[in-house]
Amino acid sequence: MSESLRIIFAGTPDFAARHLDALLSSGHNVVGVFTQPDRPAGRGKKLMPSPIKVLAEEEGLPVFQPVSLRPQENQQLVADLQADVMVVVAYGLILPKAVLEMPRLGCINIHGSLLPRWRGAAPIQRSLWAGDAETGVTIMQMDVGLDTGDMLYKLSCPITAEDTSGTLYDKLAELGPQGLITTLKQLADGTAKPEVQDETLVTYAEKLSKEEARIDWSLSAAQLERCIRAFNPWPMSWLEIEGQPVKVWKASVIDTATNAAPGTILEANKQGIQVATGDGILNLLSLQPAGKKAMSAQDLLNSRREWFVPGNRLV
């Protein structure tokens, strides 16, 4: 194989752990792992380690958990490892310019979109939300900007009509490690060909919020159906009935024109709960009332038919 590189890995969630796992079997030398501090989790608010910390400790790797990389003493932790390259995957901390310049080959990042489209915090969700036909991963050389560095390698995958953010996350978690290993080989061989991002093609993937996930019936049925998939598994599209939030897990579009006001219930039967939108009809197929499990529209109608009387309006 190519030259074995000394690598610092920085990441936090499961998505990052899949990349570290691939690195550990690649023949490269992971000399240290940076991850976020343990966080309170669960009902007992017990301090829990990140998936990266768990994996790194299982493998006997040195683990560092600074709150910030701005203090000089924390930057020294990076310098002391004398790495060839630092691999950053969903780390969650800003890397100051001094840290970016420490490794011989700099720092590289795996981003969950085909840059320059969807720079920012929620690229997987926004690609679905916007109705993109494909997405993928970009491995880029990091600089001080937000996902602005030169692109080193890309892998793409189609977005299907059934994809949710959850399924797309899994697809990209398979692609990312493949792209990472290829990029490291090119960096080691000196064959990497950095490509500058075209600033005219930039879009930004803003963070999601629970309020954005509230169903706005003035939007088109097609847009709402995409939102339902984009916001699954978080924050989940929802509507309010009698003061209670009801999550929507699945819906379909019925391409039939209607003059009914957006939010008007048109039909409620075993085929679903059909609601007028700003353009077309949205057929609600799977819902989850507060405190209950997700269920089919038919099962919900069996217990709460009064919520979905045709002619009534959802707000």
UniProtKB/Swiss-Prot annotation:
Keywords from the named record: Protein biosynthesis, Transferase
Molecular function GO labels: methionyl-tRNA formyltransferase activity
Family matches, as SUPFAM superfamilies: FMT C-terminal domain-like, Formyltransferase
One GO cellular component term: cytosol
Assigned EC number: 2.1.2.9
Matching NCBIfam families: fmt
Identification of the protein by name: Methionyl-tRNA formyltransferase
Organism of origin: Shigella flexneri
